[in-house]
Amino acid sequence: MLDLKFLRQNPEAVAAGLARRRFPFDLDAFLALEERRRACITAAEQKKSQRNAASAEVAKAKRAGGDASAALAGLGALSDEIKALDEDAKAIDAEVAALLLGVPNLPHATTPDGASEADNPEVRRWGQPREFTEFAPREHQDVGAALGLDAERAVKLSGARFAVLRGALARLERALAAFMLDLHTGSHGYVEVVTPYIVTDECLVGTGQLPKFAEDLFKLEGRAAYLIPTAEVPVTNLHRGEVLPESALPLGYTCHTQCFRSEAGSYGKDTKGLIRLHQFGKVELVRFVHPDTSYDELEKLTNQAEAVLQALELPYRVVALCAGDIGFSSAKTYDLEVWLPAQGKYREISSCSNFEDFQARRADIRFKPDGGKKTAYVHTLNGSGLAVGRTMAAILENGVQADGSVVLPRALVPYMGGLEVLEPEGKRA
């Protein structure tokens, strides 16, 4: 949520920032609400002054032994008017708060200008895409079908956009998650947490998915609760309503969960394979940091996600999302895009974002500076470290051999019990 005080003091600057991200903020409507609110407050203050004067007159009349009934009646009427004005002001405050819940974060000054993903500048690349000289690149779903990716049974169980993994691919899914968690806890200093897959609507308001993106979520019938779209939601909300000591910052958590998304608006996109599913595994990185260091922390977080791709020997690039493409809660985002040979392009595998104090205001997450100073909001960051299914897809496409086998990255061999090559199921038999 935006800082209401900053918005009231700098409405034109806020409108300009929101215009960068193509958000149609109705500045006139907000200013009209503010004018109504100020009018209520001013009128209430005037009535309170009148009530104080009337109270003094009543007291004076009583001391003199006179009749104070008329003054008392007027005093009661003033109190009723003040109560009504205060209620009007509270109603306007609630209207402003509801309006702010639907307003996205302001893009950081270093977030590039642009309208869509076509305007996202490339920051850097790592690795050299493999040249296929003996055979054409193969789609990961075709490679996976011979290794244990069962699309037909997934449809039978759950419908479209689900996956069943069997045998070596099921083990690879488990190995990837374990490898990522070990890297982030062992080398990057994260604390691993295990959280529920069901959260309250309050959690989703805190991280910014609600109220604006309800159609993207799976809601539990009869409850104000949802399946998580990402571990960002429960992990960020671990400290909702808390005040952290400054000495605890930066604080980092990593979490492997299944994620659930309706994929509303993605009809016809990536209908096969592991790229866009209703349920998918992901290892998440969440950081609570001091506001003064949050952009250094964003670079660090991005490098930590990159370390997974480098260890898995997967070519990738980093792009900076433009103002028109960043997520609702983000001030600045880097996307990591892994090379998929069969598609002949880089595809998103991680987003690393700095939300500044946007989520912290919504979820009321503060820290107390050393020395007993006034509390302040933390800055929150998160990134995928990585999406497990998309990582598997990249391994299948980049490691496939002419006979349909797949050479595994060296870093995964210990997690696969020494297995270096995935063989097609028929060949293994």
From Swiss-Prot:
Coiled coil: none annotated. Its EC number is 6.1.1.11. Keywords: Aminoacyl-tRNA synthetase, ATP-binding, Cytoplasm, Ligase, Nucleotide-binding, Protein biosynthesis. This is Serine--tRNA ligase. Its main location: cytoplasm. Belongs to the class-II aminoacyl-tRNA synthetase family. Type-1 seryl-tRNA synthetase subfamily. Pathway: Aminoacyl-tRNA biosynthesis; selenocysteinyl-tRNA(Sec) biosynthesis; L-seryl-tRNA(Sec) from L-serine and tRNA(Sec): step 1/1. One of its GO terms (biological process) is seryl-tRNA aminoacylation. InterPro entries: aa-tRNA-synt_IIb, aa-tRNA-synth_II, aa-tRNA-synth_II/BPL/LPL, Ser-tRNA-ligase_type_1, Ser-tRNA-synth_1_N, SerRS_1_N_sf, SerRS_core, tRNA-bd_arm. L-serine binds at T230, A231, E232, E284, S384. Homodimer. The tRNA molecule binds across the dimer. Consists of two distinct domains, a catalytic core and a N-terminal extension that is involved in tRNA binding. It comes from Solidesulfovibrio magneticus (strain ATCC 700980 / DSM 13731 / RS-1). The lineage of its organism: Bacteria, Pseudomonadati, Thermodesulfobacteriota, Desulfovibrionia, Desulfovibrionales. One of its GO terms (molecular function) is serine-tRNA ligase activity. Catalyzes the attachment of serine to tRNA(Ser). Is also able to aminoacylate tRNA(Sec) with serine, to form the misacylated tRNA L-seryl-tRNA(Sec), which will be further converted into selenocysteinyl-tRNA(Sec).
